[in-house]
Amino acid sequence: MADNDNEDSIMDDLVEEYVETEEENFVDSEEESEDKDEIVESPSICEGFVQASSQTLVVIPDNERITSNVLTTFEATRLVAVRAQQLAINGSTMLKKKYSSPIDIAKQELFNRKIPLLVMRCIKVTPDGQKIVEIWNPREMGIPLLD
């Protein structure tokens, strides 16, 4: 139980670091954001998790991923929930339009591909304790419909 709490707190720290990076790189106008349609890779995020975790984390390179590039409903729901929680405690939004609730904002950020979170998919855990994972940016994934 303590390891799981530790990993959750580490992931929360990594998410906060990623949000800060994304907010610094956020472009206000949509015309400019279409011109700069590249994903900012931040290997330091992964390295921080590897160093802080009790398990060794092996990140599969982007060009060697084996899982689907479509978010599962669970992953999409989890992203919306985590982002809504951040927004509820005065997180800044990546949208110009005003919405009534943090959940609505989080859903729109996901559908507009502006959500500042990453998806980590565990592929397997080896007998020597290495955790093999893929890290996806939701901007490069298909998004399921959420009700």
Curated annotation (Swiss-Prot):
Compartmental location: Host cytoplasm; Virion
Keywords from the UniProt entry: DNA-directed RNA polymerase, Host cytoplasm, Transcription, Viral transcription, Virion
GO biological process, one term: viral transcription
Annotated GO MF terms: DNA binding; DNA-directed RNA polymerase activity
Keyword Transcription: yes
Any one GO CC term of the record: virion component
Region (Disordered): 20-39
Record carries keyword Acyltransferase: no
InterPro entries recorded: DNA-dir_RNA_polK_14-18kDa_CS, Pol_omega/Rpo6/RPB6, RPB6/omega-like_sf, Rpo6/Rpb6
Pfam short name (any one): RNA_pol_Rpb6
Domain of life according to the entry: Viruses
Similarity-based family: Belongs to the archaeal RpoK/eukaryotic RPB6 RNA polymerase subunit family.
Function in brief: Component of the DNA-directed RNA polymerase (RNAP) that catalyzes the transcription in the cytoplasm of viral DNA into RNA using the four ribonucleoside triphosphates as substrates.
Subunit structure: Part of the viral DNA-directed RNA polymerase that consists of 8 polII-like subunits (RPB1, RPB2, RPB3, RPB5, RPB6, RPB7, RPB9, RPB10), a capping enzyme and a termination factor.
Official protein name in the record: DNA-directed RNA polymerase subunit 6 homolog
Organism expressing this protein natively: African swine fever virus (isolate Pig/Kenya/KEN-50/1950) (ASFV)
